[in-house]
Amino acid sequence: MQIAVYSGSFDPLHIGHLAVLAYLNGRFDKVLLVVSPQNPFKGAEKAANATARLSAAREAVERHPELARVEVCDIEFQMSAPQYTFRTLDALQALYPSDTLTLVIGG
């Protein structure tokens, strides 16, 4: 299976992110929208509540049936800080050992 991994703070998740997700949805078997609880390179005091951002991402994906292959992923909420991308990819590869992961950046 081909899996796109689209991670970020999504603070907030906006129409540009949704456009990227729609593009990926048509090109991959699965798209993981990985919401990061805390970007290690940004100050926590400026970020919206992590749980609220995760919930908002889930609600946004649910409102868009054209994003049927998109799954909001909370794996970084289960990991110890700091959540660096390479650690997240290692954890995801352990969950999907026979699949190909593609990291998507930007939006």
Model regions and ranges:
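Nucleotidyltransferase catalytic core that binds NTPs
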Residues: 1-107
